[in-house]
Amino acid sequence: MNVKLRVLTVGVLFFTGQAVMAQKDSAKVQDIEEVVVVAFGKQKKEAITGSVTTVDEKVIANQQAPSVTGALQGTAVGVNIITTGGQPGNNPSIYIRGVGSINSSTQPLIILDGSPFNGNINNISQDQVESMTVLKDAGSTALYGSRASNGVIIITTKKGKLNARPQATMTSLIGVGMPAVELHETLGGADFMKYSWQSIKNAKVAEGVANPGQAATNTLINSLGYNPYNVANPIDANGNLVAGANLLWDTNWEDAILNKAAFKQEHRFNVSGGDAKTTYFLAADYLDLSGSVKSSNFERTGIRLNLESKVKDYLKVGMNSSFSSSSSNLPIQSGNTYGSSIQWIYSLPNIYPIFRRDANGALIKDGFGNNIYDYGANGAGTLNSQRPLFENENAVGALYNNYDIVKRSNFTVNGFAEIDLAKDLSFRTQLAYEQFMFDEKAYDNYAVGAAASVGGRVSQIRALGKTINFTNSLNYDKSFGDHNIGLQGVFEVYQYTYDYLQAQGTGFLPGNDVLNTSTVPESIGGYVNRERLVRYLGRATYNYKNKYFLEGTFSQDSSTKFSPDTRKGEFYGLGASWIVSRENFLADNSVINYLKFRGSYGELGNNKIIRDGAESYFPYQTLFSAGNNQLGQTGVILDAPANYDLTWEASISSTVGVDFGLFKNRITGNVDYFKRESKDLIYSRPTPGSVGNTTYLDNIGAIENYGWEINLSSKNFNNANFQWTTNFNLSTYENKLTELNQASFQNGTKRYEVGRSIFDFYIPEWAGVDAQTGMGSWFINDVDANGAVIGRKVTTNYTLANQADNKVYAGSSIPDFFGGLTNYFKVGPVDLNVLFNYSFGSYVFDSTYQSLMAGFARPGYQQSVDVMNAWQNPGDVTDVPMNIQTQNNNNATSTRFLFKNDYVRLKSLTLGYNINKDMLDAFGVNQFRIFVQGDNVWTWQSHKGIDPEQSISGTTDSRSYQSRTLSLGVTVGF
């Protein structure tokens, strides 16, 4: 789509090539012909009174994210995209204008070609998408009513063009990926042994042992279970390496687990065209992508067919259909479980080998000459005895002996008919059907690893989801001289069904991983979720002289998620705008070519209620679990008591904004201020113990988000030899609880308190290392005789510091501001697109680093190189407590592990060369483009060792790292 605009309007960001372009430089030309996809239709950009951002296919094509919504990162103002972890195919978290709930869903509604999409968004190929439109305020989203409080993303797929000959395009890419950032630096084998000895010696000193150095030497190997040296006691009583001691191995777990050359290939093909009445678009794609952890991958195949035809002068019909399937292997890449790949790197030091060793340190082979994985308990005849951690586990062995394969398929068909009933009256009916399958199968090896004791384990989940969405709309548009009105009425019925089945068994023979071959069926379970939604919608628009615009929308939604008494919800949106530059007093202004003021106000809803980490479809009803064995009889357990008064979460949204074009529209932009107040928040309320259950869902509180959005675009140079355009966007918002059913309560590292953000850290305050004892210290309140706080003082008692009154607020996990910077250059046949995204002001609690700074409190656990700076003698001034092998609170949760999380990332870079069309004509080719594409090319970050894109809660979880991907591609058009 080669969009050319005369002005920028309504906070809508349109890209030509990679930036906003002006069609004419004349300030007097101000009418805009381009239309924008909005709720249940399209509108001229000039007529939109709400806050909308559009990203087109060329911007999408310049990013390599498997999930098409990842292309919004850094390009869509007001949209915060967070991609956590390096598993390819994972969908990013999307936050539009803050976070409007504490327990319900905070993710936007996805609309695909006019209907809600419930499948996996990464099953949609970016090559099939024409544009994505983000609706951010009540004025633009109110027609989606109960599902729109978190914003709406409308994805529009490509179509053919009328009277266009067949146009075929093929794109192929081959690439390689590696971790985008460096991990925390950990100790090598020699240093680990040295400082382990030091920690044991310090413990012996504390115990009053007569010769602590010799005691540490005698204890070292027994405490670790393994000896990587060629001598029995490699460290002497003074902490030095004995003469002749050499390491037999020094395992680099990072190299063994992480994929430093992850292969990528992608192939896309489409053909489109049309005659005088019918258009078509046919596309197919294949993507094969390896992840940052070895054996992780994502493979996808898809096909799409879009057809439209004007079968009668008064009748137009169309159908959009697609099928996609994907497969992923998902080794555990987060969390602190024994099977987590990243946790393993940060837990197992280099002294523990990947493969078993004999008494001389040589590798032990099996009967086929293969190395044997070391599972931490080698037994007799081997050099080593037993690890003090993760016995019967080996992360590398798990990568290749176990698997967790997820297969998804998605089928959509969306048909419509448009009938012109009269000159200004039309009717549209649309029926969409979506079916998606989820199939996960996990296998833990029968012979080695955690499931060896039960003969292996197989877990399988199979789920089938179906969605039917039926809409009918009546549209009336009429002009009376300078007056223009539009009326729209819509009736929508939505039905969703999700059928889930899970089973697990143990005891498998070699080569068998089918559930019905298990010896012991461990568990079986299943459920069916259903939802129905009936909606009545209306929209009215009016403008006078295409200068003054008014819009009102209303929807009434009825959802089966709520009781009959609270089932109906009414939602609305109001918007107004004024194009000031069309007034006579600005008509000939040489500086201001376009100026528009706009505002909107309305109320939206949120019916995506979360219970126990999953969406709840029966939140108001009494829930039971049946099938529990009670003394051999079928039993029933109360899961949750009913609350028939439970109702919608509601969000009241208001926005004021200005759009402008300056200096013959060489500089264009928009500025928005928004406020979003969410009330009737749904959260778990405790029940009396006599009820026999802990919580039930209730409407208990309110929260608000407010902030600014700034978007600027400039056409720096535009001539035949050189083009350069720039786009910059910045967003900032604050988050605050305004109502709660209790004064406050702790939620992990946060405290929910009225007047504070739900993202404010509330933890003990680190005071440093006691120079005399080498142990940690913290600040607590200093109180007078009357109990009044008069200041802060230092204590070495962590229990006191961890009391609620002594903790402090210490930064927020949401950034002060975030956004992106895009520059597009074109010199002759060469073009370059560079996109940076950035985030400043947020804090992250690095629990991974916290575990690496335990100071050898537990034997055998890996440590950061920073423990080499630990306190050793009275009077030492350092910020690292002493290394001591005894339980202590030195690395307990506190501000010691809270860090600024600022970053700037070169998100995408595309350098292309287009061969001259005159050279291609002889070959029947009309396009030949060679390009190099990079994703996550470079990262600057204030806190090293983690990927800066962590969850919005600001806590690390030993997640895998995003990949830096470099690809070589070619596009050929016929």
Language-model features: locations:
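Extracellular/periplasmic, surface-exposed regions of secreted and cell-surface proteins
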Residues: K28, E33-E34, I60-Q63, T106-Q107, ...
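Glycine-rich, aromatic-lined ligand/substrate-binding cores of catalytic
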Residues: S812-F845
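Short, small/polar-rich motifs associated with maturation and membrane association
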Residues: M1-R304, E308-K312, K316-G318, S322-S324, ...
